[in-house]
């Protein structure tokens, strides 16, 4: 592939999103209007897939498959669900750094790579996005964090830049979007013709059930991050 034939790539992933809940796949409007107008617009002006199959539609196994292109259970870490904060320090529950990945192969081909969003493929010091092909990382290492405090289900703060914890205020979905926009703008203004690959992996609409208007319930959710009793279709739709 020639240098001028290498397009910039942005791979956007939602978490625990039912495909039929999007307007472009027949989802009904909410009381506040269309649930997914931006995604609907992308679908209307792009390519929409209508058939698919997932042999393990849960957090970490899905990500093992996406990043390696293999059946996830060929890798030891993908046999455990979930990989959570209790897995910190494990040298087996994660994506082996030596294994080829989509970002590592693109990086070897001259791409600048970044993951902004959820990783959930093992914890430092044995595993991290920076060890599996990404040049830069901003997001949580675990499967789900509070959207405001950015704490995991064990109460540990879980928001990183690279492999260092980062304190940032704001609703996580918005923080990820802002970081992604800033990253793309930097790539466009740095004077380099190096192509880029950006993985933008949102945690939304994964639990805990919090919209942008729910900052007041953070302390209640902290004691029960799964917060399953707080989920309803109205909150879910606003998180999309």
What residue ranges belong to the model's regions?
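Formylglycine-dependent sulfatase
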Residues: 1-240
């Amino acid at each position: 592939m020639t240098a001028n034939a290498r397009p910039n790539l942005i791979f956007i992933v939602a978490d625990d999103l039912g495909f039929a809940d999007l307007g472009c796949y027949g989802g009904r409007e909410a009381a506040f209007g269309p649930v997914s107008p931006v995604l609907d617009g992308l679908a209307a002006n792009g390519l929409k897939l209508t058939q698919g199959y997932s042999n393990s539609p849960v957090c970490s196994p899905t990500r093992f498959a996406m990043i390696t292109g293999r059946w996830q259970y060929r890798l030891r870490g993908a046999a455990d669900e979930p990989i959570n904060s209790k897995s910190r320090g494990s040298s087996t529950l994660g994506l082996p750094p030596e294994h080829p990945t989509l970002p590592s192969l693109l990086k070897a081909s001259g791409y600048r790579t970044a993951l902004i969003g959820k990783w959930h493929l093992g914890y430092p010091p044995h595993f991290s996005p920076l060890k599996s092909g990404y040049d830069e990382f901003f997001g949580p290492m675990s499967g789900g964090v509070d959207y405001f405090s950015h704490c995991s289900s064990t109460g540990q703060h879980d928001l990183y830049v690279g492999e260092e914890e980062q304190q940032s205020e704001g609703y996580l979905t918005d923080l990820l979007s802002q970081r992604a926009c800033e990253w793309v703008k930097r790539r466009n203004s740095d004077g380099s013709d190096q192509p880029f690959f950006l993985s933008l992996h949102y945690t939304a609409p994964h639990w805990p059930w919090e919209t942008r208007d729910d900052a007041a319930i953070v302390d209640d959710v902290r004691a029960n991050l799964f917060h399953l009793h707080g989920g309803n279709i109205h909150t879910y739709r606003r998180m999309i």
